């Protein structure tokens, strides 16, 4: 689908820890399957779900743009709130690392979804019919987990999955392919919560498959 994509998240969306061009959003931006589309990477290292909410308010009021949106030929200029077709939400890892619960994270995610839908003045069915979609994503597992926080992350992911199914929202599963690759013995992390180049490539493949199905 030729569209404008807004990727809102933290360092996992930003592509922290790998050379420029190897984050999953950047890989999508340079994939010919998305030629003519615009990829706006609004990932900020260390951000929380509340921070994402605050930034989404500014994005929708056209006060903020991604510093360097990845653009390819054929896309008309315009601000994100007017031209955006797809919003992709990936957040909560930093909240969990700060000791927040799965319930807290889920309520914040619901707030983000509500803000997006309310800003356009229409319900989800109308959003999809007009090409203004919403995608939520499951968090990758924590590779370094000294405080046993993966169970909280998994509970949060379960809530996201159920919510997406009940609301009919598109869902990117980043958790399963990264866990399976790690369990298989592949090194897909930099030694902490951030994927390495292979890990981001796996995320890119999962995102590409979902986005092309919309």
Model feature map: region roles:
Residues 57-214:
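Alpha-helical cap/lid subdomain in secreted, periplasmic
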């Amino acid at each position: 689908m030729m569209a404008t994509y807004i990727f809102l998240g933290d360092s996992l969306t930003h592509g922290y820890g790998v050379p420029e061009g190897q984050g999953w959003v950047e890989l999508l931006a340079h994939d010919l399957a998305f030629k003519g589309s615009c990829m706006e990477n609004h990932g900020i290292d260390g951000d929380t779900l509340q921070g994402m909410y605050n930034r989404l308010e500014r994005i929708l009021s056209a006060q903020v743009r991604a510093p360097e949106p990845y653009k390819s030929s054929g896309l008309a200029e315009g601000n994100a709130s007017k031209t955006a077709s797809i919003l992709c939400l990936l957040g909560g890892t930093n909240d969990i690392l700060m000791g927040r619960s799965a319930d807290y994270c889920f309520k914040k995610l619901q707030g983000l979804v509500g803000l997006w839908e309310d800003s356009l003045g229409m319900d989800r069915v109308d959003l999809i019919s007009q090409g203004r979609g919403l995608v939520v994503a499951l968090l990758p597992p924590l590779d370094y987990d000294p405080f046993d926080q993966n169970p909280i992350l998994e509970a949060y992911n379960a809530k996201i999955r159920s919510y997406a199914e009940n609301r009919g929202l598109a869902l990117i599963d980043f958790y399963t392919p990264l866990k399976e690759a790690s369990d298989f013995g592949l090194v897909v992390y930099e030694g902490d919560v951030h994927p390495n180049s292979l890990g981001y490539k796996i995320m890119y493949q999962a995102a590409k498959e979902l986005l092309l199905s919309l």
